[in-house]
Amino acid sequence: MKYEPTESMKGKIEAVFTAVSEWYGIPLEQILSRRRDQHTAEARFVSIHLASKIPMAAWPSIGWYSNRHHLSCIYADKQVMEWKETDSKFAKRLTGVTEAVDPLLKPTDKPKKV
């Protein structure tokens, strides 16, 4: 595929999606599916939102992994930000899942000294 991410980036994105699926208690395959029920869609949107926080993660790479167009990923991210501002229960869920995923969002490569 045109925007296929590196193996390292694939692993990081998959780790975020897997952690979110475990937190929500639904299989990873369900998050990556075309299902549109509210629980699955929320988990998918949150996965995309948190994957965008990975250093050097690009929308096309996240879209490649989630089998979505990169514009759909941008929409998901914007929806999560809107829900966070307008729905206090969602904001609490987002905080919980973010705390669970946060260690995966840290850069793992140490900068090289020149």
Say what each PLM segment does:
Residues W59-Y65:
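Short alpha-helical "recognition helix" segments of helix-turn-helix
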